[in-house]
């Protein structure tokens, strides 16, 4: 799988490096993706996800089940 967050759908974007002389060259902006394990208490099992750091903060505030349901409904997550 590519560098894509399974919860927020964040992925690599393109942009420009801009020098002091205003010369522009293409570059990529990669999201901060981490591989993280969470315990899904409803199913009594561990789930491994590739997440952006913002998604990790969202899970810690809203809860794993709610975030997984929303990501599945949005189409970012096929199976967990």
Curated annotation (Swiss-Prot):
InterPro entries: Ribosomal_bL28 (IPR026569), Ribosomal_bL28/bL31-like_sf (IPR034704), Ribosomal_bL28_bact-type (IPR001383), Ribosomal_bL28_sf (IPR037147). Pfam families: Ribosomal_L28. The keyword Ribosomal protein applies. One of its GO terms (cellular component) is ribosome. Residues 1-23 are annotated as: Disordered. Belongs to the bacterial ribosomal protein bL28 family. This is Large ribosomal subunit protein bL28.
């Amino acid at each position: 799988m590519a560098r894509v967050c399974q919860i927020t759908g964040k992925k690599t974007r393109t942009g420009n490096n801009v020098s002091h002389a205003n010369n522009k060259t293409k570059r990529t902006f990669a999201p901060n993706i981490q591989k993280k394990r969470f315990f899904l208490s409803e199913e009594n099992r561990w789930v491994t996800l590739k997440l952006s750091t913002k998604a990790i903060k969202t899970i810690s505030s809203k809860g794993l089940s709610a975030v997984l349901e929303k990501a599945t409904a949005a189409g970012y997550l096929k199976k967990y």
